[in-house]
Amino acid sequence: TRVVHLSGGCVMFANVETAATLGIPLLTLLVVLPLVGAVMVSLMNKAQAEQIKLVALVFSLVTGALSVYMLAKFPSGQAGFQFVSQQSWVSEWGISWHLGVDGISLFLVVLTGVLFPLVIIGIDPHHDQKPYLAWMLLLEAGVMGSFLSLDLFLFFVFFEIVLVPMYFLIGNWGYDQRVYAATK
């Protein structure tokens, strides 16, 4: 267990292992995999609709599987954040890539990891799948990052990342008054 003092108070971090897969910390993978999937889907040919859906589904399923793996390995008897990943980002301003999961965010991350593949499976084939799936994967990355971030600036970045795909998803694929709803 490691204790980090912040502004007179303290926050306890337990289990500071990286839980590395391929040398990348588990929580970082939960955020980066959907981003990589979104980029790959964006670069694919629009005519390959089935392959686009398959690529998006694979990236989302792997992310979901990693979140369920994290649930299975989560030491519920320990206090503090688990699977912590911290790397200095903009050290002059005290901004870092700081991810962790606790008992509350754990279930939100698993729920996100399980629901997004189901959304991808249930996509309406009449929609333009390529941008829809790219926005969905970007949204998944932003939601995962929002639930996992322990740095306030990083949380703000992920929260903003969530808003951009939501705007386009609602504005392009919503129903009546979708443009009004997207700008609200």
Where are these regions (language model features)?
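Hydrophobic, membrane-inserted alpha-helices
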Residues: 36-38, 116-117, 138-144
